[in-house]
C-alpha cells in the first residue's frame, strides 16, 4: 500500500519506491543466485542490494534525466550509517555472527548504508568496469552455490589486479568513524604557511585508513 500512490507525491517518495523495488530485484542475484555460507557475510546480500539499487537508479537518471540518487543516499542513508557506527553497538561490515541473535541485530545501518557506502568506494578503487566484470565472474563461478568474502575478493582481484587485503582489513573488518581535520599555521599577513590534513581514529578501533583527497 505504501508504494501505490493515490495522489501527487514528492520526488523523494518516488525515489524511495524505486530503490526499494531495485533493492529487492538485486536479491535475485545477491542472495538467490549466490547465497552466503553463513551470516558473517550478510553484507554480501544487503550491502550489495543497497548499492545496486542506487547505482541502477543513477544509471536511469543519466539516461532519462532526474535527480542524482546518490545525493539522497549521502544525506539520508549514509548519515544513518555514520550515526550507528558511533554507537557502542557498532560492528564491522563483515561481522562475526556468533549466533542468530547477533544476526537479527545486524540488519542495521552498518550492514545496509555503511556497507553500500564502502562498496561505492571499492568501485572507485578498482574501477567500475573492473568491478562489474569481477562481480559477473563471481556469479558465473558460484551460481546456485554458497560463498564467503574471500570468493568475491578473488574475482575482484582477478579483474582489477588490485591488492584488496588492506582495503578489506581497514574498511570491511574494522568498525568506527575516523575523523579528518585540517591543521595549519597562518602568518601575520594571513597567509597559510602550513596546511596538513590529520586523521584520527576512535580509541576503541585505533586503525588509520587510506583516503584520497580531491
Describe the predicted segments one by one:
Residues 1-204:
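Hydrophobic alpha-helical and helix-loop surface patches within well-folded domains
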Residues 205-214:
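Short coil-to-beta strand junction motifs in C2/discoidin
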Amino acid at each position: 500500500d505504501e508504494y501505490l500512490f493515490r495522489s501527487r507525491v514528492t520526488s523523494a517518495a518516488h525515489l524511495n519506491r524505486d530503490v526499494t523495488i531495485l533493492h529487492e530485484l538485486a536479491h535475485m542475484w545477491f542472495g538467490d543466485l549466490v547465497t552466503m555460507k553463513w551470516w558473517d557475510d550478510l553484507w554480501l546480500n544487503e550491502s550489495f542490494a543497497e548499492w545496486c539499487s542506487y547505482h541502477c537508479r543513477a544509471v536511469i537518471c543519466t539516461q532519462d534525466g532526474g535527480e542524482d540518487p546518490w545525493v539522497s543516499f549521502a544525506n539520508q542513508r549514509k548519515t544513518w550509517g555514520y550515526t550507528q557506527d558511533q554507537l557502542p553497538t557498532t560492528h564491522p561490515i563483515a561481522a562475526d555472527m556468533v549466533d542468530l541473535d547477533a544476526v537479527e541485530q545486524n540488519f542495521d545501518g552498518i550492514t545496509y548504508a555503511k556497507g553500500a557506502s564502502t562498496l561505492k568506494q571499492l568501485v572507485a578503487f578498482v574501477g567500475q568496469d573492473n568491478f562489474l566484470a569481477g562481480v559477473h565472474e563471481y556469479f558465473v563461478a558460484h551460481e546456485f552455490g554458497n560463498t564467503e568474502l574471500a570468493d568475491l575478493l578473488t574475482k575482484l582481484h582477478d579483474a582489477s589486479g588490485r591488492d584488496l587485503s588492506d582495503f578489506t582489513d581497514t574498511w570491511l573488518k574494522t568498525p568506527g568513524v575516523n575523523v579528518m581535520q585540517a591543521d595549519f599555521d597562518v602568518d601575520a599577513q594571513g597567509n597559510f604557511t602550513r596546511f596538513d590534513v590529520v586523521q584520527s581514529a576512535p580509541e576503541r578501533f585505533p586503525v588509520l585508513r587510506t583516503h584520497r583527497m580531491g
